[in-house]
A protein has these predicted regions:
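Helix-helix packing/entry segments at the starts of transmembrane helices
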Residues: 35, 97-102, 169-179, 217-251
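Membrane-interface interhelical linkers
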Residues: 1-5, 41-72, 121, 173, ...
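Hydrophobic/aromatic residues within transmembrane alpha-helices
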Residues: 20, 32, 36, 87-88, ...
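C-terminal transmembrane-helix exit sites in multi-pass transporters
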Residues: 86, 103-122, 244-263
Length: 269
């Protein structure tokens, strides 16, 4: 399904950003984020052009009721991407994986609270066990796992907002990404036109930045399609694909899975 493809792509994404860093040297997180936004927007616009849906995209920006949900969704998506990129660049992929393991359970809770989806006593017990896992993770990660908590909360709320939207899924996601573009372009123009940004762009860097837009935009499109056609709780279950692959990526990238971290993961599994 579209949702499964989405989480497979997300699961292996850390390796792409790791590759970018290894081939191009340490890239400023903010500059990488700005390039990611711009090229993801280009990717989405191309998809909408092929599908003949560009008029629907422009209509979103004229609908105040839709914008009331799209703007918060865009802000949450921006925050999620920013935290994720920073974590990957700073060797905290396992913390990201822990956050993505917790997300489904936050989604379960939101599904029950907002959309009145039935949550059994088993789900309640599972959520309680996960809370214990989060508390234990403060030891394994050397303090409160802020990356874990931030990613879990932001994307879960984002999923709930997406579930409440009635407009075309791909159009919705494209609108959210497009809203970020002015901020990204202003940042590049004012702060990264020198050698630490655009001035230092080689052909390889440019190709990797374009690729970053594709690996960002495509999963979001698949997610937007899947979340509209699946119960929120089923979406939550599919989310376990990505963090499981994230642990594999963390191992490839040299992160140590200590005993304390393993105990935290076992509680959440």
């Amino acid at each position: 399904s579209a949702m499964a493809v989405c989480f497979l792509l997300w699961g292996f994404q850390p390796l792409y950003w790791f590759l970018c860093t290894n081939l191009c040297g340490q890239i400023d997180t903010f500059f990488l984020m700005a390039c990611r936004i711009v090229w993801a927007a280009v990717c989405c616009l191309c998809i909408l052009k092929v599908q003949g849906k560009l008029p629907r995209l422009w209509a979103v920006f004229r609908d105040k009721q839709v914008l009331k949900r799209e703007i918060p969704a865009s802000v949450l998506l921006f925050g999620d991407w920013m935290v994720y990129l920073w974590a990957v660049q700073n060797g905290r992929v396992l913390e990201c994986s822990l956050g993505y393991y917790i997300q489904p359970l936050v989604v379960f809770a939101l599904g029950a609270l907002i959309f009145k989806e039935k949550m059994s006593w088993r789900h309640s017990v599972i959520i309680a066990i996960v809370v214990v896992g989060i508390v234990l993770s403060t030891s394994g990660f050397g303090g409160v796992p802020y990356v874990t908590i931030a990613l879990a909360l932001m994307f879960a709320v984002y999923a709930a907002i997406k579930k409440s939207l009635t407009i075309d899924s791909i159009v919705s996601t494209s609108a959210e990404i497009l809203m970020m573009v002015p901020v990204a372009l202003l940042f590049i123009l004012f702060f990264r036109m020198g050698d630490d940004g655009m001035g230092g762009m080689t052909v390889l860097k440019q190709l990797l930045m374009i690729g970053g837009g594709v690996v960002t935009g495509l999963p979001m499109v698949f997610y937007a399609i899947g979340v509209r056609h699946l119960p929120l709780m089923t979406t939550g279950i599919c989310q376990y694909i990505s963090p499981s692959l994230g642990i594999v990526c963390g191992a490839i990238m040299g992160e140590a899975l200590t005993r304390e971290k393993l105990v935290s993961f076992l509680f959440i599994w």
